[in-house]
Amino acid sequence: MLISLPKVCGIYRYNVSMSKMTWLNVGGQADVLFKPRDIEDLMCLIKDAELPISVIGATSNIIIRDSGIRGITVKLGKEFAYIKCKDNSSIVAGGAALLSNLAYFAGEQQISGLEFLAGIPGTVGGGIEMNAGAYGSDIASVVKFIRAVNLEDGNLYEFSSEEMGYFYRGHSLKGRWIFIEAEFKGVSSEYELILQRLKEVIDKKNKSQPVRGKTAGCIFKNPIGCKAWKLIDESGCRGLDNGVAKISKKHCNFLLNYNNATALDLENLGNRVKDAVKDKFNIELEWEIRVLGR
C-alpha cells in the first residue's frame, strides 16, 4: 500500500474477504480491516488516517458490493463487547456487544424492557446507528446515553437519547460516527416473567421469518402509514427468484441468498422489487439493508 497507515496498538489485516464475514456471504475484499485495542487506539487511527474509513458491525444487515471496500474498514472486537450492570435498572454495553446478548443479560439481572432485542441479530453500535427495533419497540425507547467517536475529527462525544434526535430507523446526528458504548434503561421485574417474554420474542421471530436462510433482515423500511412487506406482496413479488437469490415466501421483506448469489445479484433483485412497488403504488421504498462498497 502506497499510503502509510497510522501506528496503532490494534490489528491491521490486509485484503480481507468480506464474503466470509457477512450474513449474506457476499462481498469483495476490504483493503484494510482494523480492530482497535481501545478507544484511544481508535481515536488515533481516525486522527492520523489518510485513507477513507468505513465501519462494520455484525454485518447482519449489510450488502458489501463485489468490488469490496476501499481504504480502512473498522470493526470493533471483543474489547468492545462487554455488558455490565450500572444499577438495578441500567446496563452499560460496548458497541460490539450483540443485542441478543444484551437482552438475555438484562433478563439474568431481572431488568425488563429489553426483551425485544433478543430477536435482532446485530451489535449495540449498529443498533444505535439505525435505531433498530422490533415488535413495537426500538433502541430510542431504551437507550439513555451514548458515547461515540466522530469519524471526521477523531474526538469522543457523549449524547443523550434526546440529543440523538431519533426517528424511525435513523437518527439526526450530523456527520459520521462509530458508536462505542451505550447505557440502557429498563425496569426491575421477575426473572420468570422476563424469560417468558424472551421466549415469546424468539418464537414469534421463528414463526414469521426465514431464520435458517442466508439473509440480512428486512430489505426495506416501512413507508409512513403502511408495511413494506404488504406492498411487496401486493406487487406480486413474494417468492420472486432470479436463480441465485429470491424474495422469501415466508416473509416477503426478506432477501435470501440460496445459490451462491453475488452482491450484484442481491442488489439487483432488491431494486426489481423497488421498481414493482413504485409501478403499482407510486411509493418509493427505502433500503433498510445497508449497501457498502463501490
Swiss-Prot record:
Which cellular compartments is it found in? Cytoplasm
Q: Name one GO biological process term.
A: cell division
Task: Cite the EC number.
Answer: 1.3.1.98
Would the keyword Flavoprotein be found if you checked this record's keyword annotation? yes
Q: Catalytic positions?
A: 169, 218, 288
Enzyme class, spelled out: oxidoreductase
What catalytic reaction does the record list?
UDP-N-acetyl-alpha-D-muramate + NADP(+) = UDP-N-acetyl-3-O-(1-carboxyvinyl)-alpha-D-glucosamine + NADPH + H(+)
For activity, the cofactor(s) needed are: FAD
Just give the chief location class. Answer: cytoplasm
The alphabetized UniProt keywords are: Cell cycle, Cell division, Cell shape, Cell wall biogenesis/degradation, Cytoplasm, FAD, Flavoprotein, NADP, Oxidoreductase, Peptidoglycan synthesis
What is its pathway?
Cell wall biogenesis; peptidoglycan biosynthesis
Q: Can you give the residue ranges of the FAD-binding PCMH-type domain?
A: 26-189
* Gene Ontology cellular component list: cytosol
Name the InterPro entries on file.
Answer: FAD-bd_PCMH (IPR016166), FAD-bd_PCMH-like_sf (IPR036318), FAD-bd_PCMH_sub1 (IPR016167), FAD-bd_PCMH_sub2 (IPR016169), MurB (IPR003170), MurB_C (IPR011601), MurB_C_sf (IPR036635), Oxid_FAD_bind_N (IPR006094)
Tell me where on the tree of life, at the top rank, the source sits. Bacteria
Q: Name one GO molecular function term.
A: FAD binding
Q: Which family does it belong to?
A: Belongs to the MurB family.
Role, per record: Cell wall formation.
This protein's name: UDP-N-acetylenolpyruvoylglucosamine reductase
Q: Which organism is it from?
A: Wolbachia pipientis subsp. Culex pipiens (strain wPip)
